[in-house]
């Protein structure tokens, strides 16, 4: 159970990080 929570939290963190990074790149590109 503990590993499932850690894996879920890590996956969520990576999704948020990737989304924010792509959003910044998309904003800087002027689109």
Curated annotation (Swiss-Prot):
InterPro entries in the cross-refs: Cytochr_b6-f_cplx_su8_sf, Cytochrome_b6-f_cplx_su8
Main location: plastid
Membrane topology, as annotated: Single-pass membrane protein
SS bonds (residue pairs): none
Location(s) in or outside the cell: Plastid, Chloroplast thylakoid membrane
UniProt keyword terms in alphabetical order: Chloroplast, Electron transport, Membrane, Photosynthesis, Plastid, Thylakoid, Transmembrane, Transmembrane helix, Transport
Subunit-level organization: The 4 large subunits of the cytochrome b6-f complex are cytochrome b6, subunit IV (17 kDa polypeptide, PetD), cytochrome f and the Rieske protein, while the 4 small subunits are PetG, PetL, PetM and PetN. The complex functions as a dimer.
Record function comment: Component of the cytochrome b6-f complex, which mediates electron transfer between photosystem II (PSII) and photosystem I (PSI), cyclic electron flow around PSI, and state transitions.
Descriptive protein name: Cytochrome b6-f complex subunit 8
